[in-house]
From Swiss-Prot:
A Pfam family hit: Carboxyl_trans
Leading EC class: transferase
GO molecular function, one term: ATP binding
Zinc finger (C4-type) boundaries: 232-254
GO cellular component, one term: chloroplast stroma
Naturally occurring in which organism (per UniProt): Populus alba
Pathway: Lipid metabolism; malonyl-CoA biosynthesis; malonyl-CoA from acetyl-CoA: step 1/1
Cofactor: Zn(2+)
Protein name listed in UniProt: Acetyl-coenzyme A carboxylase carboxyl transferase subunit beta, chloroplastic
Transmembrane segments: none
Lineage of source species: Eukaryota, Viridiplantae, Streptophyta, Embryophyta, Tracheophyta
Cofactor: binding comment: Binds 1 zinc ion per subunit.
Amino acid sequence: MKKCWFHSMLSNVELEYRCRLSKSMDNLGPLENTSVSEDPILNDTEKNTYNWSHSDSSNVDHLVGVRDIRNLNVDDTFLVLGRDNKKDGYSIYFDIENQVFGIDNNHSFLSELEKEFSSYWNSSYLNKGSRSDDSHYDYSMYDNKYSWNNYINSCIDSYLRSQIGIASSILSGSENCSESYISTYILGESRNSSETGNSRLRTSTNGSDFALKENSNDLGVTQKYKHLWVQCEICYGLNYKKFFKSKMNICEQCGYHLKMSSSDRIELSIDPGTWDPMDEEMFSLDPIDFHSEEEPYKDRIDSYQKKTGLTEAIQTGIGQLNGIPVAIGVMDFQFMGGSMGSVVGEKITRLIEYATNQFLPLILVCASGGARMQEGSLSLMQMAKISSALYDYQSNKKLVYVSILTSPTTGGVTASFGMLGDIIIAEPNAYIAFAGKRVIEQTLNKTVPEGSQAAEFLFHKGLFDPIVPRNLLKGVLSELFQLHAFFPLNHNLSRTLT
């Protein structure tokens, strides 16, 4: 006979679902972690369960999670372990083969649980002698083990649904939308899922830290709720969108730096109220009448302008960074992959020339797939034009240019101004390359080693200077500029007065 355990912990502090394995059903010792669950965290109080006086088996061969409940076989012995809000334990025991049902640890909290199964306990159908006397009895409903199993599963579903509602109601009103998603996902979507992996859901007491880890097979469900969550492309963890911007688009699960829009980067780096954009009226035309079978180039530009609210794939302007006047250009990967066309190159060139004339430090944040193919050689020409302007800025005026490489930085941007900085800073785990992995493998027919185009690997090869996380970037830039004698305006004013 196969023995199955399901461990459910419900409390005011957390709502978690975990799978654990016990050594024995007669003498339940500490619960051990298995490969089904990768989270080894268990409080001491969670490691103790209760003895079963009526159990006739000593080994547990299998364990299940929330999604596995519905896949139980008729020969399974099923045990549910749970905890109420007062941390008092209770246990529910099912022997599906022998149709045995029991509850251990008689506590007042169990009365709520008993209601879920009262329809079965009080049913005359449990008494085989009375079945023939009931005209409403459905002979096919409980006569086979599969139906009995399905009924128990429905009871468990009903009970879990009620307890999730109790635990979720503790949360404040600001998490109502998340609560709705949580309940729908566990009790609705997962019911139709064929995935057998376990799922972990955690809600903290401050109401601002939601995390739901799921396997890559759940991408369809995630897309349905993408207006609430941002999924990490590395660990597939979900980040609550409401707080994602305040966390600088850094995944709460693995710390991966996800893509940021140019507007968010400007807001992150530039002091509030000091941003003055340049050349906003410039936009791309179709200089070579690029032919496309799918969508005309002009129409594609228009669609990206409506989607992003930008006129081109870069924003340029001047502002203050901790009081230090700077000229800054930030590329936006959401606009045609941050591709560099004639307008992007012209805006960068004008920014460099302005910084040269005003003796300002220069920052260029790179996020691009390379030169824009729809503009042909005109886009390639921007590489030389920008490099020429930077030569005058760096060599003749002796000013400081800081290049910041984000993910991805590839193609013509990498081959030109991306690698020309006096100081080159990279974000953690940034994808930096000239040609992409797919292009290299198809061209050379060789496999590109995994991670060979990541910032950490290239850092050890001396390709750039520091790797700086986003939360430290503004402070690092401020110190670098002050090291090169660029000081805040109020600091210069105080020096002049003295």
